[in-house]
């Protein structure tokens, strides 16, 4: 996997409204709405860019056409730009495009699809082809897996300017089929159905150290023991749509508790920050002395970060503690370094919400 500056950061610098940018449109992500030779776990290296979001490479077609995608546990569809995208779709011009004429395994579908984001609707039509992870296996990522007959979206219109600056071409959703647009079987569910891995498991290692090599990894079919000590802790999925679990509470030092009495939370690799209800996050920022900026961001004086309280999430009776360095982000611009809070307030309405979203700030710890 590779890390890149989030759309939110890139577009925020261009004064775009944050509601259009964070998590590729979480309002719509959360508001509404299963024979080849088996093999061992398949690693996919992810790249870390400026401690923000993560992408990896896949191939679509025969021979494979390579695309960079966000492996997103907060959505369930795979889409990439199409060679047939609209003339005025600038985002399409600057990214790799799928060309069905160059694939011997392409099967026409043609059903139209729409995925709604805060800045507009991404639209196109469905197609079917093989999907390879990674695109071209190498010595650093041996093996690989090819999923046959995978339905995916060819995007012919991408909304607003959000995707223009993106360092990824598309998105590969890894949530449950229940939230898949057009009821398309997600890639990993198709992979399981075709019995391409011994264990129906995938795992992420996200390293927030941008200098670390290899930086991050997605493992299909298992876990990589070199990235953890001891035994794994399991939490029940409370609703098979997103990777949704129950959070008992969230403590800010000894001065504040939010999510009192418990709440629901989503573990989402496609969101950079931790997102919670507006009123609760406002209280959290008050407790850590963060100062509001424009566009929903909060700043913390960098010299005060080390003295901030720890933030502890209690999940299934187990404490997961974030240090101040874990939940703050250093951003340098025009020679000046500022420290931003890793928390964002956003109210997610029923039936999907209210929810906390545990993004890369949490997962990367």
UniProtKB/Swiss-Prot annotation:
Gene Ontology, cellular component aspect: extracellular region; lysosome; melanosome
Glycosylation: residue positions: 109, 236
Keyword Metal-binding in record: no
Transmembrane intervals: none
UniProt-listed SUPFAM superfamilies: Acid proteases (SSF50630)
Database matches in Pfam families: Asp
Entry's Gene Ontology molecular function annotations: aspartic-type endopeptidase activity
Keywords tagged on the record: Aspartyl protease, Disease variant, Disulfide bond, Glycoprotein, Hydrolase, Lysosome, Protease, Secreted, Zymogen
Record-listed E.C. numbers: 3.4.23.5
The Peptidase A1 domain, residue ranges: 54-365
UniProt keyword Hydrolase present: yes
UniProt-listed CDD domains: Cathepsin_D2
Localization of this protein: Lysosome; Melanosome; Secreted, Extracellular space
Propiece span(s): 1-39
InterPro entries assigned: Aspartic_peptidase_A1, Aspartic_peptidase_AS, Cathepsin_D, PEPTIDASE_A1, Peptidase_aspartic_dom_sf
Outcome of swapping residue 268 to N: In CONCL; inactive
UniProt PTM comment: N- and O-glycosylated.
Active site per database record: 72, 268
Record's function text: Acid protease active in intracellular protein breakdown. Plays a role in APP processing following cleavage and activation by ADAM30 which leads to APP degradation.
Family label: Belongs to the peptidase A1 family.
Subunit details: Occurs as a mixture of both a single chain form and two types of two chain (light and heavy) forms. Interacts with ADAM30; this leads to activation of CTSD. Interacts with GRN; stabilizes CTSD; increases its proteolytic activity.
Disease tied to this entry: Defects in CTSD are a cause of congenital ovine neuronal ceroid lipofuscinosis (CONCL). CONCL is an autosomal recessive disorder. Newborn lambs are weak, trembling, and unable to rise and support their bodies. However, they are able to vocalize, support their heads, and to suckle if bottle-fed. At autopsy, the brains of affected lambs are strikingly small. The deep layers of the cerebral cortex show pronounced neuronal loss, reactive astrocytosis, and infiltration of macrophages. There is severe degeneration of hippocampal pyramidal neurons.
Name of the protein in question: Cathepsin D
